[in-house]
């Protein structure tokens, strides 16, 4: 049992609370409803309270045993609704682990892993016959679920500490966001959450078999969320690494994680991930289905796919990417593209359609899929299998034909009260981004948009977290509800631990930039708290309020390693003899001393002087045409 | 003489040509006018030709001796104009080296450095009595200078190779940029350059004492340029490091470099930098003037400042940041800011104005400054000393009052035919960026805008190259002509070699994203060439066409280190058994085989089927109001 030990020691690194931070719980209307926030204690005695995705891992008081999984936050809420039942579930099959990769598979090791963590293999629940257990179904019946209340408390956080920053009316008016059509209330109520879910403008991904999830919402009237992808592949990686990547990803702020495993042990990997995840987990079930048919796309069948959906729904996957918009009549539209079909799911389905010369079974069986989704409350993430793989292919007919189809499918899903979001590109130059949002809003009826980037240029391999963070920030501002991260390894290889972090931080920047631009009060206030700390030379507070306190501190210490410099009223850019912020403090004292009245009188005098000066020469405008 | 040897070995690292690349010269109308481009030879036999800022350093045929400086590209052009004269110039003074820092100054070492590279100390030129030697002055008289022709050839590059990518009409129309008011011709002529310079919409920073410069233009109708800052400070750094940083910065694509040194040996450092720089060098002369008065802002005088301008103009500095818009009547406007005055130059002048209760001597002596600028063709970079230091302070009255003043000063500068650009912020949330461009265009009459970022959020210390690349890309698209980079160390410490590179790459991404969005044909085509290489699994070409081939190759090799994988038709993301790009190639063959006619007929049949399907349930729209 070496592997779990290695894992536990890796995990201990990610369990450290953030500096000067502790987990705090906002109590809800019932004893088992408590919403976590991260309180950062500043050196001036103030507290700033931040949205916290990291789950119990950063709570020093909680004992974690990854072989048993996390406690089930939602356990009682689900059973109390009395519309679900336990059942034996589908039995575990060798094929579920991707056994077509038999040549590199170690059955002995798999058996050990499963035996060593048998608590992670749970008895599943499903809707009772005829019941629909989706959050949308409850919402449309006017029921405010504990999940909705949880989301409301979480989106608000502790508004008290923001008061100081929101009080300055002149400033608040000047920097007020441009919500670009979003309607973000000052205070999010549980009823508001219910209404957003009911009308399909937000989803709360929360499979009834994932009681460990801390509920969160994806919708344009909430904070912009980010998704991180993890997953082994045929070439590299291991179960332990993937679970640790999950904990690492949520530490840095991933709101959702997609498990894109394609290699061996994928069923057991998924058990480990879901049971240890406080954030919703998404998958692309066609990947596993393909493994079951040995990687031969044309051998896929509806039955194998359906069985895979049930397998994963029973494990607790919160949303499925389903590429049901890749229809046979659209495939030839990609033939003249610069980069064809680049979505893996899209090309699997394209290959299937071509091989059989038939319409996609995902499209034709869409209502059957809805029936499975609503029995577990799995949300749709309608995949954009025909998304552009280069700027040259952006916004073409293949892409938009699929998007319109996703709009049709959204209405079918909503007929079944199945929660739905829509995936978007990909590679889109800046000037073509807004059209993506406009088309999505128009055809998909405000279902949440969930985009990959988009990358704004194609020439930055090794830096596509940056080329895409630009597009992500812009489309987030425009109304996209969740941004799927891109790591520096995009197009080149598999992200390691540091790549995952780099991708997440870039996307936290993009999402926060979007929140600030939209006018989210919590976003603006965190910026202000850090700016104030920066201006007042509270170095520790500046680090601790940042997205990555460790890196900020390390960078600072490279130039000025002495502890004393962290309270000094200067920094390494200007040195001890001169500092612009120090001078500004003198300006402030000057203005206070002189009084604004005098300053304004002086301004008038100077303006007069300026007019004289300009009259003496400044106003003689020389035509700028060349003489000849 | 250990230091120069250390330097030479450092430099050899940055003299390696880029992989598969060689320097190529586009001949102009005279034998001494040859414009460098970097030709990248692809594995399929094609050549892609790129804009090249790296100067002779990446030309294996050129012998470099940093103690003698670069050859003077413009030497004959300047003397042939017969409007300048050599003169003895100002004598070197101990004070020029920042000797007020006497406690940490090593006079012996300085003497050695100067003696070991005495060729770098040149006899200066200036305009003959009554002459005006600015590019703007020539342009307004209808003269197309060699500098203007050089810029035209450089902006075009080799358009031949782009033909393939520009030929696809459907695509060209779909992805055509939105120039946001810019007017970028398909082919840049020397006459177009002249006209842009004449009307002040572009500048060619090219001091007559910097003949080594390879002329380039900054203007919204040319490619978006980037600036990198280097410079020692009172706390760290050395001359050798600064020169090597210059060569390193232009290798990665800096179009301009600002030397912001504030510490010891600043005069000699500047000689080294200018004589070895093929790109324009900018400075903030008030920094050196402050050194001369021992760091006491109130001791600054017009005479000391004027002498510093002449000192630097004689050395060949191409543009001066002058904070002449920081006027006494504006200073109290910053008193209620979250972060006051954060520009170093701005706070120096604010302190001076307060101490003397007098209007800024930079403002009052502005026409005297113009007289100096036009005698050497130093361009103005009118500094934004009151730029916001946080999102909370963005677009406030202090900032815009200064901007309007910079507009007034631009007209005075233009009266003297002095080339002028305008500096801009700083920290601006996304939704407030466009207003900055609008105000600048309105008040500054299309003089080129040169912004620092802007940073879109404040909570990313350690990652502000990313938070600002977002703002830089957006404002570049909106019409900003040059983007001043921000490194990961911003707000935290002094950038080292790797930070400089990270900052530059982030800004090359921003500038290129802006060029693509504006519709620059050269930008779009490079994206397309890389995308095509990516789609065709030409891994080496994908690396070599990227902004940083080394990093792309290294990232790829981490996962698949074998050389064989670089020609393999798969990558590490999907593995050898399945690959979306491989499937796309099958789609393409399928579409070609079936023929588009059949595909379209099939599409119609499918659409009919879809309509039937939808009629059977899809159209029953369930109202989404909750039941209760």
UniProtKB/Swiss-Prot annotation, chains A, B:
Pfam families referenced in this protein's UniProt entry, alphabetically: ThiC-associated, ThiC_Rad_SAM
Annotated residues for binding of [4Fe-4S] cluster: 571, 574, 579
UniProt pathway: Cofactor biosynthesis; thiamine diphosphate biosynthesis
Record protein name field: Phosphomethylpyrimidine synthase
Binding site for Zn(2+): 427, 491
Keywords in alphabetical order: 4Fe-4S, Iron, Iron-sulfur, Lyase, Metal-binding, S-adenosyl-L-methionine, Thiamine biosynthesis, Zinc
Matches recorded under HAMAP family: ThiC
CC cofactor: [4Fe-4S] cluster
Catalysed reactions, semicolon-separated: 5-amino-1-(5-phospho-beta-D-ribosyl)imidazole + S-adenosyl-L-methionine = 4-amino-2-methyl-5-(phosphooxymethyl)pyrimidine + CO + 5'-deoxyadenosine + formate + L-methionine + 3 H(+)
Assembly and binders: Homodimer.
EC top class, as a word: lyase
